[in-house]
């Protein structure tokens, strides 16, 4: 996994700040592969409170703090997209 311990803590803190402590977070995509370089931070979040405003604020907060592009996918009620299963199956739970 190509994130430092402090970056991982920052991500979990910010996501929990915006979505609550019950939010579950997965890192997926190129940052999971230690052999790759660069790339954005792909995050998948499951929460009981998937509000669009919280999603936007969280994304901006993470991008400013990490100085990296963040792709944030938040599961919404009734949604079941393939990317959600991929993120959970191939990703790393933070």
Task: Write out the residue ranges for each language-model feature.
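Catalytic core of pol beta-like nucleotidyltransferases
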Residues: 1-26, 32-38, 46-94
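Conserved RNP beta-strands of RNA recognition motif
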Residues: 43
């Amino acid at each position: 996994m190509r994130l430092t311990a402090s970056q991982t803590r920052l991500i979990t803190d910010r996501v929990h700040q915006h979505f609550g402590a019950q939010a579950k977070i997965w890192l997926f995509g190129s940052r999971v592969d230690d052999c790759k370089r660069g790339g954005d931070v792909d995050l998948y979040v499951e929460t009981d409170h998937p509000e669009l405003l919280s999603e936007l604020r969280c994304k901006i907060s993470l991008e400013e703090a990490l100085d990296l592009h963040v792709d944030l996918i938040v599961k919404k009620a009734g949604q079941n997209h393939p990317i959600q299963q991929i993120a959970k199956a191939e990703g790393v739970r933070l």
